[in-house]
Amino acid sequence: MKPGFSPRGGGFGGRGGFGDRGGRGGGRGGRGGFGGGRGGFGGGGRGRGGGGGGFRGRGGGGGRGGGFQSGGGRGRGGGRGGKRGNQSGKNVMVEPHRHEGVFICRGKEDALVTKNLVPGESVYGEKRVSISEGDDKIEYRAWNPFRSKLAAAILGGVDQIHIKPGAKVLYLGAASGTTVSHVSDIVGPDGLVYAVEFSHRSGRDLINLAKKRTNIIPVIEDARHPHKYRMLIAMVDVIFADVAQPDQTRIVALNAHTFLRNGGHFVISIKANCIDSTASAEAVFASEVKKMQQENMKPQEQLTLEPYERDHAVVVGVYRPPPKAKN
């Protein structure tokens, strides 16, 4: 193998032929090969350091192999660039989405974002973007539709999510709080999110999240028994449910009867496999909608979550709608 040509994918990081350990650069970044590469000249100096960085989103990429000092500084960095993403907000515009409290970040790649309620804090390693507006800097957090059913529904074009600034939301099946954190961003300091989760392990993460976000109230209880936590929760405007249980419509109905105001709304994420793995997804969705109608819950729209989730649908509707005035 010729000096200075490392194998694709970096094999050994390509130690760059002679150059004084030049480049072990590339390293974790996948494209390894480039790192080592140019080592050969001048004591390895310009080994084009941590290659990788670029891949995981414009992040801190380890500069150019530690400047010129000989030895090439092993091209630090690259590695975990991704976190801060297009931090500086150069060439990035943020515009409001038609759902109040949700925004679209337009840059090299468009992304769904929410305004960070706790600037400087990342909840689950998501990218953050700071935009200067006058003298203020506003920080936004990227919202990944592959990790959040609500984000998938919004990108899928759902007509209404009913979660908006100032709303009081009951979130069933909060898990570790990935989506809850974004709902907390949307409702803002004047809103509230009651996050119900049965698993104690996820509940720990949820409680830690609530320490920093004062509008989240964690409830570590089984959503099947709303009477156990009825003293903690006031009437709410919206119920969002992602419980993935065979009797999930019944669970949502029990909570709606207890906490949801008349004319309030619900957003339910349905995973067909969890309810009946033998029937087709469409049949499962249809039967769940029927059950909702029997519980005074009037579905208004249904949307599948392709391409983000398989055999998932979101149903949005209204609870006990007020009777229409007759003319």
Swiss-Prot record:
Modified residues (Asymmetric dimethylarginine): 8, 15, 21, 24, 28, 31
Enzyme class, first EC level, given as a word: transferase
Chain segments carrying region Disordered: 1-93
GO BP, one annotated term: snoRNA localization
Catalytic activity: L-glutaminyl-[histone H2A] + S-adenosyl-L-methionine = N(5)-methyl-L-glutaminyl-[histone H2A] + S-adenosyl-L-homocysteine + H(+); a ribonucleotide in rRNA + S-adenosyl-L-methionine = a 2'-O-methylribonucleotide in rRNA + S-adenosyl-L-homocysteine + H(+); a ribonucleotide in U6 snRNA + S-adenosyl-L-methionine = a 2'-O-methylribonucleotide in U6 snRNA + S-adenosyl-L-homocysteine + H(+)
Cross-referenced PROSITE patterns: FIBRILLARIN
Any one GO molecular-function label of the UniProt entry: RNA binding
Location in chain, cross-link Glycyl lysine isopeptide (Lys-Gly) (interchain with G-Cter in SUMO2): 90, 108, 115, 137, 149, 164
N6-acetyllysine PTM sites in chain numbering: 108, 127, 211-212
Main location: nucleus
Gene Ontology CC terms: box C/D methylation guide snoRNP complex; Cajal body; chromosome; dense fibrillar component; granular component; nucleolus; nucleoplasm; nucleus
Similarity comment text for this entry: Belongs to the methyltransferase superfamily. Fibrillarin family.
Name of the featured protein: rRNA 2'-O-methyltransferase fibrillarin
Species annotation: Rattus norvegicus
